[in-house]
């Protein structure tokens, strides 16, 4: 993956004038591409859209504690997603499960969370198939994973 970003930037929005200001130093993470907050707002989950997090060509998902006063992020842990180029992360309504879509290879994975930190991967489901455009649809590509309203 060719991305070069090294962090997650936290900005403060001023509704009075519509301006954005840096609120905290960037959280360090290689090529973050999608983030989501836990339902209680205390943990930020972010995917690292890479294909070399481990020796198996996996991307990564990180859990970061959010300081609600300053916006600063503190790294809790990182887990391999089981597929390359994770592009989406979501949390169920109860805040217990974190789910990731891996674009390359078309897989989705789930993790439990305890106090914000991610467990080892609970499940990994690989989709198969290809699309009609062989130039860009040579394999399945997961774009997102979203839990239903009743989890």
Where do the language-model regions lie?
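Structural signal for beta-propeller blades
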Residues: 8, 52-54, 59-61, 106-109
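Beta-rich catalytic cores
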Residues: 4, 30-33, 85-87, 141
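Residue position within the beta-strands of beta-propeller blades
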Residues: 1-2, 46-47, 100
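Asp-box/WD-like beta-propeller blade repeats and closely related beta-sheet repeat scaffolds
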Residues: 72-144
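Short loop/turn segments immediately following beta-strands, especially the blade-tip
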Residues: 11-18, 64-71, 110-119
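Residue-level detector of Asp-centered blade-edge/turn motifs that repeat once per structural unit
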Residues: 39-41, 91-95, 149-150
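An edge-strand/N-cap motif at the start of beta-rich repeat modules
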Residues: 1-11
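Glycine/small-residue-rich interface belts in oligomeric ring/scaffold proteins
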Residues: 25-36, 44-48
